[in-house]
Amino acid sequence: ERSLPKAAVCFTTPAMTRRAAEWLSRLGGCRPLAILSDDFDDIVWQSEAENADLLLLGVSFSEGAEEPRDITARCDVAVEVRKRRPECRVYLACEAGHPERLPALEKAVELGLIDGYFIGELTARQARLWLAETQRQRRMRS
């Protein structure tokens, strides 16, 4: 159990975050951690305090949201988390239906701000790939 990577999860609502953490728990291959506060500083602090190996951030493009959790905002979180935990891999789970966002996502990966992204309902296959990449990186460090 201790050898499994710690996967921190933060989506736009606590309920979505809990569901994602429970889903990862059922999927296996990691020790999931729900970050229930979507506040920038809270995400950064908790990722560092919990020694997260992987951070999965939900991205919302909804116009009605009080504070849209867009790609730029999430990349800002990723950069700050990486300053404190350079070994933490950061992935974005984006809502579907916004093909115009693809260039920004590609650029974020190209610039090394994030390690990857998924659009739509995150699949078990994709989550396992990310966990495997994280585990491989952890082994190379130790």
What do these predicted ranges mean?
Residues 39-43, 53-85, 94-104:
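Conserved phosphotransfer microenvironments
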Residues 55, 90, 116-117:
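Two-component signal transduction core modules
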Residues 9-40:
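Two-component/phosphorelay signaling modules centered on CheY-like receiver
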Residues 33-38, 94-142:
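Output/docking surface of receiver
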